[in-house]
């Protein structure tokens, strides 16, 4: 049973700003994307890695493939994340039994998380890390609170999201014209109920410059 990691690194980072996509910015001695690549490289539960990058970054793709032995190949992504994932799934079809789809701008995954997810997906077929909501959650329309959502049932979902390959591939095939906000939604649309694995809030997505400040602090405090 083979498991591949599909690393989505094709985003341009418009909200972040700057000329270099945030996944290729340096945190100390490594690019943001490399932190998760290091984990996949060292996990005995991951057999291969495929990276999808933006157009114009061939040099970085080549560097990463040379540096990390589990990186089988890289290719260019699309202009939307869902299309990038679909392309990645097409590229690895028939090569693996399970796939872990990961956002390159979530650098702080670890080996223990990967192990938990891979062991769980063998029986659940769709699983993702998540952190329970700690703040009170309001449903708001046009700036006005409509109601309060019980936070004990609210989780903030992260990546990598791990699937039985045939399940997620079939879901993307069926709903290829629908752009859901994460991969779990595709299998949810089939009636599947994914499993959640509780995780640390350190596995956040770097979206803004403030997030990068937090990421640098984490590296300096815990990873140097």
From Swiss-Prot:
Keywords: Isoprene biosynthesis, Nucleotidyltransferase, Transferase
Claim: Transferase is one of the keywords in the record: yes
Annotated site, Positions MEP for the nucleophilic attack, chain positions: 151, 205
EC number: 2.7.7.60
Catalytic activity: 2-C-methyl-D-erythritol 4-phosphate + CTP + H(+) = 4-CDP-2-C-methyl-D-erythritol + diphosphate
Family listed: Belongs to the IspD/TarI cytidylyltransferase family. IspD subfamily.
Protein name per the record: 2-C-methyl-D-erythritol 4-phosphate cytidylyltransferase
The organism of origin for this protein: Caldicellulosiruptor saccharolyticus (strain ATCC 43494 / DSM 8903 / Tp8T 6331)
